[in-house]
Amino acid sequence: MPVHLPAHSRRRFLAHLAGGVVAIHGAAQLSAAEAEGEKWVLFSDTHVAADRMKEARGVNMAANLERAVKAALAKGQGVKGVFVNGDCAFNTGEAEDYATFTGLIDPLRQSGLPVHLTLGNHDHRENIRKGLKEAGDKKTVVTDKQVSIVEGKAANWFLLDTLELVNKTPGLLGEAQLAWLQKELDARTDKPAIVMMHHNPDVKEKPTGLKDTAKLWEVLAPRKQVKALFYGHSHTWTVEQHESGIHQINLPAVAYVFNQAMTNGWVEVSLAAKQMTLRLHAFRVDFADNGKDKVLTWRS
């Protein structure tokens, strides 16, 4: 049951295809030059509560999401869509949390931007449907998991579901989802693949991130079309590279930080044929990476 919130306007809409695939309308008609400037907005860990005045760790989560939405809208017409990478809700994923979340992101949809969601450990599969009311096809291609593919011109985005137990820290993909991912990657070798999931890779004996990280890399590493892996969960901004050459990007939280040396904020992504450019929009304006471009070249 992929969770996609279509744009309200007719400027851009989504074509829902079989098997959890979503195509951005008009992407196939983009010229190579237009594809070079394909931009996306990435949010993670918004942790919105039903009460817009709710605070955690000294932060009003609703106000932070509102701030991120306004900044993203200021980017103009070049943005193709928005991804929210899990932990959309505050704690246990109540339906009322998602109702508030929907209201906060509605200006994006009003402006013509579709919004694509993944689930984190503070989300709830049933309640997200109740709270969002309109979130795409309810059919599942992997039992009890939300998976989907967003097909852009410059890259395909593979959205995974790492939610194992609500309000329990670690995450899990599971064998069925890994098999789905392998199959869908093998069917799409014509353009770069970007994988997105909520939980961070974690190979510790007692992981707090993704429990089946090693199995995920067995799928991703040998498939050369896979160029980048985005995740959140740790409320940390880092850009690293796996030994396979796949770029690993830990998205900052829109909500709050666990470490005061870190920043919250959001990330702007610009795709090209052989590279991706990241720009961090930090809420801490004095943060070292704020506003700076990081150019990541695709592995060959």
Can you describe what each PLM-predicted range is?
Residues 2-25:
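N-terminal secretory signal peptides and thylakoid transit peptides that target proteins
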Residues 32-98:
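N-terminal active-site segment of His-dependent metallophosphoesterases
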Residues 34, 267-300:
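A short C-terminal boundary segment appended to hydrolase-like catalytic domains
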Residues 45, 86-87, 120-121, 198, ...:
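Active-site glycine-centered loops adjacent to acidic/histidine catalytic or metal-binding residues
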Residues 48-54, 166-167, 257-259, 288-289:
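Short, solvent-exposed loop/turn elements at domain surfaces
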Residues 94-183, 187-188, 192, 212-225, ...:
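Extended active-site neighborhood of metal-dependent phosphoesterases/phosphodiesterases
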Residues 188-204:
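Short acidic, glycine-rich surface-loop motifs adjacent to enzyme active sites
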Residues 196-200, 227-237:
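Histidine-centered catalytic micro-motifs
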